[in-house]
Amino acid sequence: MVMDIRVLTPDRVICSTTADEVILPGLTGQVGVLDGHATLITALDTGLLRIKLADKWTPIILCGGLAEIDRNRVTVLVNDVEELVAVELSEATKELEKATSAIENAETSKARLDASVELKKATARLEGINYLS
């Protein structure tokens, strides 16, 4: 069985498709969703959303939000998304190193928080590259 999934930002529809399986970046870990899942509303962290249809995974980087799951329908409301385009592995690795260094050298809690968000995005980019290659 397949389920419907919609990914929405405040200003546009990112995708509206069907899926065999969805993996969401929850605040306490990944949330796997299959057809017939119990009704659930969950907060999402910055991370990688994975949508599987016909043995093909599609990754999307989410920047926090909410997901509503109702048996065969998943609605993802996010602040923003980052599209994965042809990013070089070496470039993504450099971004991860830069974000790690920014956390280590942060002098204020705001700088540390901003750096941690960038670290989550950089980690999601690397995970996404693995799905694209």
UniProtKB/Swiss-Prot annotation:
GO terms for biological process: proton motive force-driven ATP synthesis. Its main location: plastid. It is found in: Plastid, Chloroplast thylakoid membrane. GO terms for molecular function: ATP binding; proton-transporting ATP synthase activity, rotational mechanism. It is a peripheral membrane protein. Keywords: ATP synthesis, CF(1), Chloroplast, Hydrogen ion transport, Ion transport, Membrane, Plastid, Thylakoid, Transport. It holds the Pfam family ATP-synt_DE_N. It comes from the Eukaryota. The keyword Membrane applies. GO terms for cellular component: chloroplast thylakoid membrane; proton-transporting ATP synthase complex. Produces ATP from ADP in the presence of a proton gradient across the membrane. Belongs to the ATPase epsilon chain family. F-type ATPases have 2 components, CF(1) - the catalytic core - and CF(0) - the membrane proton channel. CF(1) has five subunits: alpha(3), beta(3), gamma(1), delta(1), epsilon(1). CF(0) has three main subunits: a, b and c. This is ATP synthase epsilon chain, chloroplastic. It comes from Thalassiosira pseudonana (Marine diatom).
